[in-house]
């Protein structure tokens, strides 16, 4: 009798959980679309605002032949407003449909261990879902392409074919963010709603996310041993300026071909990635000190960072 009671209770728990998962997926299904990104490429997309769909940049192959499909309906044309490699996000606009945006929630409401669902659509438009937990939460970070992510959300979910760009949904039927497989090796990262909002705002306003640049092509070269002591401890490599783009911030500041760049904003740089990493901490319009060696003399130039556009 006791075993029968326990079995019945277990069935009740699993039945309740199963219904809750199915109902949660159904509750957001009208806001999830299939994105046909050109060729055979498909991904999922999320209705973020009326007429505005957010998907992942990695799923777009051609910007001139984009379509989105709602459920089993016929695909409709979509226009690429802009895409951001730094965060792997792309913003599409449609003239029909996309009338039911998702309800979002901030990453601060998430808890490690809570059950979450990745909700997307297949290439045929069928709703798809996978479940897991929030495996890790963390503070803001920068992607390998220089994008600023407001907080780390790493779910333990498997994304099936077409689920890149899917929504990560919590038990309250709110969307924590957009799922991407392009920001970390062999891992799903959820781009939090705050980051998505910021990128969408920038793209709708400017067509891109503004990021500062110098406008100089450089290559790492060793600093002669005889000069290392003269230019400071740790200066064993510098960046040789090979080309300066006309009217770029570097040109305006007086950086010349042949200069050796030692540091940017007070930080030694040993390779181009070091420069990009340092620039990613700054904003368009910021003044930045660039230390160079010219003709054996160390000097510091003030560069006003601009938007590459």
Spans of model-derived segments:
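Active-site/binding-pocket entry motifs
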Residues: 86, 139-143, 175, 220-227, ...
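C-terminal recognition in membrane/secretory proteostasis and scaffolding
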Residues: 1-12, 23, 40, 49, ...
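Soluble non-cytosolic domains of exported or imported proteins
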Residues: 15, 19, 107-110, 128, ...
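His/acidic/aromatic-lined binding-pocket segments of jelly-roll/cupin-type domains
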Residues: 25, 43-46, 166-168
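Short, conserved catalytic or interaction motifs in soluble domains
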Residues: 37, 121, 139, 180, ...
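Conserved active-site neighborhood of the chymotrypsin/trypsin-like protease fold
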Residues: 9, 32, 38-128, 153, ...
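A structural signal for short beta-strand/turn segments enriched in small hydrophobics and glycine
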Residues: 51, 113-119, 168-173, 250, ...
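Active-site region of chymotrypsin-like
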Residues: 29-31, 90, 95-103, 128-186, ...
């Amino acid at each position: 009798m006791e075993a029968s009671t326990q079995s019945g209770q277990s069935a009740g728990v699993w039945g309740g959980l199963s219904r809750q998962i199915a109902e949660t997926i159904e509750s957001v299904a009208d806001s999830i679309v299939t994105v046909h990104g050109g060729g055979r490429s498909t991904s999922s997309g999320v209705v973020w605002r009326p007429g505005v769909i957010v998907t992942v940049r990695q799923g777009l192959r051609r910007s001139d032949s984009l379509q989105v499909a709602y459920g089993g309906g016929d695909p409709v044309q979509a226009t690429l407003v802009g895409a951001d490699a730094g965060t792997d996000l792309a913003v599409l606009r449609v003239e029909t449909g996309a009338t039911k945006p998702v309800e979002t929630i901030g990453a601060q409401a998430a808890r490690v261990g809570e059950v979450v669902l990745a909700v997307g659509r297949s290439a045929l438009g069928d709703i798809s879902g996978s479940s897991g937990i929030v495996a890790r939460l963390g503070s803001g970070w920068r992607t390998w392409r220089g994008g600023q992510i407001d907080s780390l959300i790493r779910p333990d979910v498997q994304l099936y074919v077409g689920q890149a760009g899917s929504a990560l949904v919590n038990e309250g039927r709110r969307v924590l963010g957009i799922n991407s497989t392009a920001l970390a090796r062999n891992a799903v990262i959820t781009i939090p709603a705050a980051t998505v909002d910021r990128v969408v705002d920038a793209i709708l306003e400017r067509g891109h996310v503004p990021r500062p640049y110098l406008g100089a092509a450089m290559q790492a070269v060793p600093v002669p041993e005889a000069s290392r002591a003269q230019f400071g401890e740790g200066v064993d490599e510098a960046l040789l300026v090979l080309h300066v783009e006309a009217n770029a911030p570097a040109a305006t500041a007086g950086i010349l071909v042949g200069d050796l760049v030692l540091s940017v904003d007070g930080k030694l740089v040993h390779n181009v990635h070091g420069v990009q990493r340092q620039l990613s901490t700054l904003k368009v319009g910021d003044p930045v000190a660039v230390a160079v060696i010219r003709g054996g003399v160390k000097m510091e130039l003030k560069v006003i960072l601009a938007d590459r556009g």
